[in-house]
Amino acid sequence: MPDKKLLSQVRAIFFRSKEMIVVLSLFFASIVGAAAWQMTRAISTLCDDAALGALDIPLKFSLASFAVFSFLAFEMSYKLRRYKLDECMNTVAHAKRKIFLAQGVIFVVIILIFFAFFNIWSLLLFVKYRNFNCWHGKFIIQTVLNMLLSHFFVPCCAAAMGMSASLLFRRINGCLGLVLFVLLGSPLSNYLG
């Protein structure tokens, strides 16, 4: 586990970076906007499928979260190298691992905030659609597992992939690799071939 001083340095570099804060703020604002739009819409009383379709809207942000967190982690690792933090830590044993862990801790905290918001959004949707046939135990368990996969594990893997790409490749090659990976994982890949 990295020490508190290293964590505070990594956190300070992250919050000092205006472009990363702007991207993260815009991403969270789009999520809050989508949640507010969905919560203010009128409920269709036609069938249970309308409720089930509305309950899976939070899950549609998983690809966007993958892209955002992979590029944020890539830029964060690049900034740490640009500020020569890894070069200063070369005198310490296992310094690169400690920097990688410190950066990972910062991203896990951000991802946990992201994950908590999506869980609150899903809970509010379940309350909104309480009169529909969506309170089955199996459906709730499936929704929780999907939320865990889509909004915790996918962003964590994206952050780890972005940090690793920054360590392995130069800036342009790493960004192009991440763009290619995001495109291949998106629905656009169906139209590429």
Predicted regions and their residues:
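Aromatic- and glycine-rich beta-strand/loop motifs that create alpha-glucan
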Residues: 1-26
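Alpha-helical membrane-protein architecture signal
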Residues: 3-11, 97, 101, 141
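Central hydrophobic cores of alpha-helical transmembrane segments
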Residues: 25-30, 173-186
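Secretory targeting signals
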Residues: 29, 35-75, 101-174
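Helix-loop-helix units of permease transmembrane domains in multi-pass membrane transporters
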Residues: 74-110
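Hydrophobic transmembrane alpha-helices of multi-pass small-molecule transporters
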Residues: 111, 186-187
